[in-house]
Amino acid sequence: MNDIWWQTYGEGNCHLVLLHGWGLNAEVWHCIREELGSHFTLHLVDLPGYGRSSGFGAMTLEEMTAQVAKNAPDQAIWLGWSLGGLVASQMAFTHPERVQALVTVASSPCFSAREGWPGIKPEILGGFQQQLSDDFQRTVERFLALQTLGTETARQDARTLKSVVLAQPMPDVEVLNGGLEILKTVDLREALKNVNMPFLRLYGYLDGLVPRKIAPLLDTLWPHSTSQIMEKAAHAPFISHPAAFCQALMTLKSSL
């Protein structure tokens, strides 16, 4: 049986599980690891099939969450970025007793645009799936470029993301395709109405993948959660605005 790559870092008295986004791996947290490690015990994870967690095929969201849960501490703050936000949210929904607080970063409970719901057009996600089989490397690079578009440090941030991808083995096309399928089909809007632990949602004002318009909609749908929009950030606020990002987590921790 395969196991996922999992590293513990830091010495804080509060556990924080960090889950990366599509196509990436746990190295994406490198820029904030030192800062957070002095306040939290960090759990850095490569999701199944990504980075050093090779040997897994495509998974459903439920399967991916179950695999991550096997290694996780009994109690932790769960933070998920983008696709990782769906995994963290699914964990909060299925194992609420193990989730001290939920943090989603540039994530949506429903990434696909639906009637009355802003998001990515399903045909765009479908197009990415098609392009994966045609030109795998270029498709991943295009997706990474979209994540930093519009920020003052867009080029530099895109290079950072690319170096993270290249630092570890590339995921198989099947795994990447499965991740896009999750983004295209999953809808946790109703499920998360029943989650009642502290719940912080962080957004980038300039995010081209997760529109900030969803923030007020979810404020209404999930009144128990709080949202924060980072003004000059796009889809990777922890890379473009690490100090403000870490401060938001510190504030959350002090409120628990």
Curated annotation (Swiss-Prot):
| MF annotations from Gene Ontology | pimelyl-[acyl-carrier protein] methyl ester esterase activity
Q: Would I find Hydrolase among this entry's keywords?
A: yes
UniProt keyword annotation of Hydrolase present: yes
**One biological process GO term for this chain?**
biotin biosynthetic process
Known EC number(s)? Answer: 3.1.1.85
Q: Which UniProt keywords apply?
A: Biotin biosynthesis, Cytoplasm, Hydrolase, Serine esterase
Location of the AB hydrolase-1 domain: 15-242
| Subunit description | Monomer.
HAMAP family assigned = Carboxylester
Q: What is this protein called?
A: Pimeloyl-[acyl-carrier protein] methyl ester esterase
Organism of origin? Salmonella newport (strain SL254)
